[in-house]
A protein has these predicted regions:
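Glycine/Thr-rich phosphate-binding loops that ligate phosphate moieties of nucleotide
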Residues: 1-31, 38, 70, 74-111, ...
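Gly/Ser/Thr-rich active-site cleft segment
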Residues: 2, 10-12, 23, 117-233, ...
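Short beta-strand-to-turn element immediately C-terminal to the catalytic PLP-Schiff-base lysine
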Residues: 20-21, 86-89, 133-135, 156-157, ...
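N-terminal phosphate-binding loop and adjacent alpha-helix
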Residues: 30-69, 118
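Gly-rich Lys/Arg/Thr-decorated short loops/hinges at beta-loop-alpha junctions or inter-strand turns
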Residues: 34-45, 163-169, 192-199, 355-360
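Short beta-strand segments
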Residues: 77-80, 148-151, 232, 243, ...
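Acidic, glycine-rich loop-and-beta core segments that form the ion-binding/anion-interacting portion
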Residues: 229-286
Length: 360
């Protein structure tokens, strides 16, 4: 009897796998870490092969810790970071690093898109990063048969089937109600060739993609009877997990960044610095409106990496204890959390972080 399901979270710092029963109780879980590389200020990259390895290791350990047999797993779905962009062949092969969601190298492309379309996209978004690749790495772009996101790449390697997520594609000009991408948007950019490299069809969260391939089943320690269903952006799927899935609800997601997302019948914000996605970005009939910051928890990790190497794995717990003795106002120390630019309210990828008020 296949009574259990697996949820995978492909996050910034690693892959986490959870085994759930039919009531939603967690029976087992595991985390496998991978590295982020920062080759230049404002850049952030990861190796796609590291994702596959981490997902395999975390799933195997989660199933083991749950004490269930692989033959009892019915389905698997994954949520990942976005927009984390990569190029690959039709067979999912790539030697190039993925451009991580927090990467701000496409600032100029974001401004160009704004000038030509009247919108003001974040440099985090897929079209901006894809346009950067075409302009700065034309051979890579020309050779690529697929330009996709982490979500799409992972699902392909699990099932052997290309598709994209409605949840991510709505950030690229996909209209769920029409079932098509906005070709006019890409024509304004003279970038319609990208449409031929986007993996289709677009599937909504929960829709079946297909069973695990034999190779994927072996890597994960499962069997080919496991169905893979479409997931979405980690923050969006987290919102569903919190039960914030009706018009008029909102949720705050925290991690390497933070994001406050609200579901409304109509766009909530009118400021060009704000961001609305939809319609039907996550929940049919709803727009999704966002606010948040690119660098939050990632700054804590930066501080740990640069200044707390001798404290070991529990460095953050030790910092928590030290912080309890710091008075309100932090003795005048102020931190602007712009390590990777500002997401809201300025939507400025070029600004950088600041620690102000240092003294002897």
């Amino acid at each position: 009897m296949r009574d259990y399901v697996i949820g995978v979270d492909g996050g910034t710092g690693g892959a986490r796998a959870f085994v759930f029963d039919r009531s939603g109780h967690v029976l087992g879980q595991s985390t496998a870490h991978y590295e982020t590389y920062y080759p230049q200020p404002g850049w952030a990259e990861q190796r796609p092969a590291d994702w596959l390895d981490a997902v395999s290791r975390s799933v195997r350990e989660a199933v083991r810790s749950a004490g269930v047999a692989p033959s009892q797993i019915a389905a698997l779905t994954a949520a990942t970071t976005s927009c984390t962009v990569l190029t690959c062949s039709q067979k999912g092969e790539t030697d190039d690093p993925a451009i991580l969601w927090m990467d701000m190298r496409a600032a100029e492309q974001a401004r160009l898109i704004g000038e030509r379309t009247g919108e003001r996209p974040s440099a985090e978004l897929y079209p901006c990063k894809a346009l950067w690749i075409r302009e700065h790495q034309p051979e890579r772009f020309s050779a690529a048969q697929v330009v996709c996101e982490y979500q799409d790449y992972l699902n392909y390697h699990l099932t052997g089937r290309w598709c994209c997520s409605v949840n991510t594609a709505c950030n690229w000009g996909y209209n769920r109600r029409k079932g098509a991408f906005d070709r006019g948007f890409y024509e304004k950019l003279d970038f319609t060739e990208l449409l031929d490299k986007i993996p289709v069809p677009a599937l909504a969260a929960g829709e079946p993609i297909g069973p695990l391939t034999a190779a994927a089943a072996q890597a994960l320690g499962l069997d080919t009877g496991v169905l893979v269903a479409q997931g979405g952006i980690d923050s969006s799927i987290g919102m569903l997990g919190m039960g914030a899935a009706r018009p008029g609800t909102a949720a705050l997601m925290t991690g390497s960044s933070n994001l406050l997302m609200a579901l409304t019948p109509q766009p909530l914000f009118t400021s060009p610095e704000a961001f609305n996605a939809g319609p039907d970005f996550l929940v049919p009939g709803c727009y999704s409106s966002f606010g948040g910051q690119t660098s939050t928890g990632s700054i804590l990790r930066w501080f740990q990496r640069e200044f707390c190497r001798d404290l070991g794995e529990d460095a953050l717990a030790q910092l928590d204890q030290l912080a309890k003795d710091v008075p309100c106002g932090s003795n005048g120390i102020q931190v602007l959390d712009y390590w990777q630019g500002n997401r809201m309210p300025h939507n400025d990828p070029d600004v950088r972080g600041l620690i102000y008020g240092l003294s002897m």
